[in-house]
Each structure stands twice: as structure tokens, then as C-alpha cells.
A protein has these predicted regions:
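Long, compositionally biased, intrinsically disordered segments
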Residues: 2-5, 29-33, 91, 101
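Terminal, regulation- and interaction-focused segments at domain boundaries
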Residues: 1-17
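Ser/Thr-rich, low-complexity intrinsically disordered terminal regions
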Residues: 22-55
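Short, intrinsically disordered, mixed-charge
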Residues: 19-27, 101-108
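Residues in well-ordered beta-strands of folded domains
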Residues: 7, 35-37, 61, 70
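C-terminal basic regulatory modules in eukaryotic proteins
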Residues: 54-110
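Short, charged/polar surface micro-motifs in flexible loops or helix N-caps
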Residues: 11-12, 40-43, 64-67
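Short, surface-exposed beta-strand/loop "edge" segments at domain boundaries and coil↔beta transitions
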Residues: 12-15, 43-45, 76-80
Length: 110
């Protein structure tokens, strides 16, 4: 799986990230798994056409010492579909920028 990983989180960093993600995206559905909706303006043509699969998401996996973001755009509505695919360059950059901005907002240094 292609991922953006930030490791060696301190306990206080983990707590701040968990609180922020819980507040912004709802509590983790499974142990540390957060579903981050992909901005509609960066969906690929195929993803935009698949209204029955919306919203599309990135997965963030937060555990005690690391945060991992999968570069797979997926749907909660289907397991297999043409719109489920690895992120485009703009989607990948959007996710990295989102995470980097969260770290900046929370003043977490890595």
C-alpha cells in the first residue's frame, strides 16, 4: 500500500492528533481508523461520475507512535469499483498538505 507516514510521535502528539481527528471527522470507526472525505473539486472524472459511490475517502490510521495515510481513494458504499484507485497527483498533494497543516495547527514538530 502506498502511504504517507509520520512516525516517532510523542504521547502528547498522539493525544492532540486523536482529539483533533475525533472533533473534525468523528470518532475512529475502528482502532485509530479515520475516514477523511476527499474534496469534490479534486475528484477524477471517473470518481465525479460515480455519484452512487460518494463521498470518496482517504483512510488515516493513527496509533500510539505513528500516523499513516493511505494513498488509496475509496468508498464506504462499495469494495470494488472503477472509482476506487490510487490517488492522482493532485489528490496525493491535497492529502499531504492537509496532514501537514494539521501538524502545523497543533504545533507538532516531527
Amino acid at each position: 500500500m502506498k502511504q504517507y507516514v509520520i512516525d516517532e510521535l510523542r504521547p502528547a502528539d498522539y493525544k492532540a492528533l486523536k482529539t483533533y481527528l475525533d472533533e473534525q471527522y468523528g470518532p475512529a470507526e475502528m482502532d485509530g481508523i479515520y475516514w477523511i472525505p476527499v474534496a469534490a473539486d479534486i475528484l477524477t472524472d471517473v470518481q465525479s461520475e460515480h455519484t452512487e459511490c460518494r463521498p470518496q475517502y482517504f483512510i488515516i490510521d493513527l496509533d500510539g507512535n505513528r500516523l499513516a495515510c493511505e494513498f488509496l481513494v475509496r468508498s464506504k458504499n462499495r469494495v470494488r469499483c472503477d472509482c476506487i484507485d490510487y490517488a492522482s497527483v493532485s489528490q496525493r498533494n491535497w492529502l499531504i498538505e492537509l496532514i501537514d497543516n494539521i501538524f502545523d495547527r497543533l504545533q507538532i514538530k516531527t
